[in-house]
Amino acid sequence: MTLRAMTDVGAELGLSPEDVLPWGTHRAKVSLDALGKRGGRQGRLVLVSAINPTPPGEGKTTMSVALAMGLRKRGRRAVAALREPSLGPVFGVKGGGTGGGQASLEPAADINLHFTGDLHAITSANNLLSALVDNAVFYGQPVALDATRVRWRRALDMNDRFLRNVIVGLGGKAQGVPREDHFDITAASEVMAILALAEGLKDLEARLGRVIIGHTRDGQPVRARDVDAAASMVALLKDALMPNLAQTREGGPALVHAGPFANIAHGCSSVMGTRMGLAYADEVITEAGFGFDLGAEKFLDIKCRGSGLWPRGVVLVVTLRALKHHGGASPARVAEPDREALVRGFAHLEKHLESVAAFGLPAVLCVNRFPQDTESELEELRAFGKARGVETAVCDGFSRGGDGSLELADCVLEMLDGTDAAPPQPRFLYDVAQTPEEKVAAIARTVYGADDVAFTASAKKDLDAIRELGGAGLPVCMAKTHLSLSDDPTKLGRPRGFTLTVREVRLSAGAGFMVALTGEILTMPGLPREPAARRVTVHDDGRVTGLMQGE
């Protein structure tokens, strides 16, 4: 495989050489100036989502890349607009986040590791603010922060459970003021969310300045701008705000930018990357993390609400193994033919299709085909979709790249062409003027299928504090398990009759939403018993292998 020069990849989109800023040989940034050169041109936006996955994932990124490849084979100027991988999953459970097989982003190892340094810049900006916070505690100026009421948390782009709760400032008075602190993984940090949602440098600085870092001794809120942090943070992030340009395995363009997790953050690639794609491409293929209940709901209710973007339709990725998993098949047998488990799993798929319809969007079912899939079970799935007015496309992009993705590309083009006369208009699940409790209930009942929502006493206190800070009118970002529609990862299929319990609510004033935490969700993951890091090999020529599953 020979990778194309980045100026050639950019030229395919219509980007001029001066707007493609090389970051090494096969990575590049796209100048923000390029956005202003296309007037009001707008391509067609396609949202790729999925049903609730099995732990290894169902190949949503692979299918997004495959769709972009298939559209390119059909003569369309298509671009994938995807999230940057985090080192946490890369070395944790899932391995790399660049797709797989013949439908991958390249250079995969570079993208999965340091890429253009965006996540390091985000981590540095986050921890610069932490240093300024502790400096204010130490000196009592420029504002007298109460050491017992610091809200800002440190960040690291790694799964490390030992850093969830730490004590800092030990070693005597000259070394600091002892206090409890916490680390979040960078992909779950508010700085990551801010970068992903920012519309430019001025907006980035304003959002960073609004971040609430703690309270004074008399209970007044303190923001990042009160310790003069925002401009210095922007200085660290100014290059990270520019979208990254990479390429598919077949040489097509891909905009890979920002990487908030979808189970503990809002789960979407950057607004700037999406806008850049829409300005230059015919079709922009973007994904939202995990199932439709998480990333896609947040894409529509948070990212689109704030930016004014709206997709033309949804591609819902399914696998036969995941449907059987939700139909009760044991993990060891999901790859085997099992019509009964497959049909039972259709109830789970139907709930996701109902959620897509709740937003007023058309959908295409995309089956990520595995070698063991049988024709009879694929036909069973096609019949299920057809009975509900949804076309089903079987995609073999993993094995055959763009050639194996033409059926999917054709179905998506047919869906998009059908919306040209009357494009779908924004339809949100709730009005931001509703109470936080009503907003959470709207999501839980409509998308998760919950009967009721409960707030713990601690969560109710959090909401009272958020109201005092003026944040009650913000959208809600749900933090929930990705393995189930409910807040219990063991409840597979289509759970009914359950109550969603919110145990904590955090205000992300800079990002512009409140985070409602449910279940056992943690904002700093831990490594599994057998982390992916243990299978990585660096060869004598510098090649890195073992980052991807099955590699």
Curated annotation (Swiss-Prot):
<dbReference type="InterPro" id="IPR020628">
    <property type="entry name" value="Formate_THF_ligase_CS"/>
</dbReference>
<keyword id="KW-0436">Ligase</keyword>
<keyword id="KW-0554">One-carbon metabolism</keyword>
<feature type="binding site">
    <location>
        <begin position="54"/>
        <end position="61"/>
    </location>
    <ligand>
        <name>ATP</name>
    </ligand>
</feature>
<comment type="pathway">
    <text>One-carbon metabolism; tetrahydrofolate interconversion.</text>
</comment>
<protein>
    <recommendedName>
        <fullName>Formate--tetrahydrofolate ligase</fullName>
        <ecNumber>6.3.4.3</ecNumber>
    </recommendedName>
</protein>
<keyword id="KW-0547">Nucleotide-binding</keyword>
<keyword id="KW-0067">ATP-binding</keyword>
<dbReference type="GO" id="GO:0035999">
    <property type="term" value="P:tetrahydrofolate interconversion"/>
</dbReference>
<comment type="similarity">
    <text>Belongs to the formate--tetrahydrofolate ligase family.</text>
</comment>
<dbReference type="GO" id="GO:0004329">
    <property type="term" value="F:formate-tetrahydrofolate ligase activity"/>
</dbReference>
<dbReference type="InterPro" id="IPR000559">
    <property type="entry name" value="Formate_THF_ligase"/>
</dbReference>
<dbReference type="InterPro" id="IPR027417">
    <property type="entry name" value="P-loop_NTPase"/>
</dbReference>
<dbReference type="GO" id="GO:0005524">
    <property type="term" value="F:ATP binding"/>
</dbReference>
<dbReference type="Pfam" id="PF01268">
    <property type="entry name" value="FTHFS"/>
</dbReference>
